[in-house]
Amino acid sequence: MRGFTAASRQVGEVFDLSSHAAVIKMMMLRFGRSPSDMFERVQATESGHNVTMKDGFEVTVSRQELQRTAEASRFIGADTQMINDAHFMLAAFAKRKAAEGNVQFDAALSSTLRGESTYNALKGMGLIGFLRVAPPDALGAPDRVGVTSTFNYSSALVVDGFKHGNGEQAPIVKDYGYQLAANIPVEPDARPARFPAAPISVKPADIWRGVYQGEEGNCVTVSAIKAAMMKYGQNPLGIFKHVTEAPSGYTITMRDGCTVRLTHDELKAARRAANFFGTDKGLIDDAVFLYAASAKRAQLENHEFRAGAGFDVALQTLNDGEVPGDALRRLGLYAFTRKSSVQELASGVPGTLANFEHSVLVVGGAFDDYGTPRDLNGSRWMHKRGRALKLV
């Protein structure tokens, strides 16, 4: 990984690409050196490249944007090809930042050059589905690779218990950081899973009364599940990238690359914890499966700093209130989630609406009141400060 590095900033200068360099190096070590390895898909076009990141976010990088990135980055080193690949990764990051911030590429690139937090650098490279918080003992373990924050918007690559940054090495002592989830091997007796209640991409016949919330604290997850079903269809195979089934349970790969294993006993536990009501048994079954997958991911990510203790604890963290957007992310849909407004949802755009008290599905200008659709216009939601989200 000595083929390239980020040049150190000068005194008084606001310039720092150490976080991006550290993340790119970790991706090279984990997935391979080529952008085609580090991203899900890279397709050359007449004017540049179409890029799909591992979380599903899509950007188009022009030759001119790549050239401007190369001129501005100050990546240095002996490996010209590695530097060129790092430039490509940085350009894609900046293009995503421009798309998410609704700004021009040059403005996004300028902002990028000023530095980035470790988490934002990882997220912007499409790694949200692979992120695992690493405590010092895991981050400093032999034969392990990670990244850690060193100062404000600076980061360092961690290899074999040492952080590498600014041409220096230092041992991991009390540092926390991030590592990428290991591959989960395919079970030899696995087969494609089947969910017979509805064909792939077909929306629920009655999203209101077919399944609705019965547990007071799990509204964020319930509204996210309903929103996903109204966007991609009721069948989990339309929401996730792929699902296989074996005698031991299910292996689920989400759209952002996160893979979880779910046992039959865990699925039963999720059914009890979800406490779903409704008139459509098949719809409830599919919603329970999504709920269980969300809880399993919460366990792997140690949601609320306690879900890692076990699946039962992870289920509890889904039932005690959450931050809007967390549940959509745990379904693998972070890259497809966008900010909206209560006015946009009231006009008919589907999504979720949340405040400090509750989170609801909104479809066709109506919000979900525990299984009953009610007109959003004129409701208390129009006058309360809330967070509106939509899927694209």
Q: Where in this protein do the model-derived segments appear?
A:
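N-terminal short leaders/motifs
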Residues: 1-12, 100-107, 190-213, 308-316
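Extracellular/luminal recognition modules and glycoprotein regions
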Residues: 6, 24-25, 29, 36-38, ...
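Catalytic cysteine-centered active-site loop
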Residues: 33-38, 234-239, 327-336
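Predominantly the structural core of cysteine protease catalytic domains
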Residues: 16, 57-163, 211-212, 217, ...
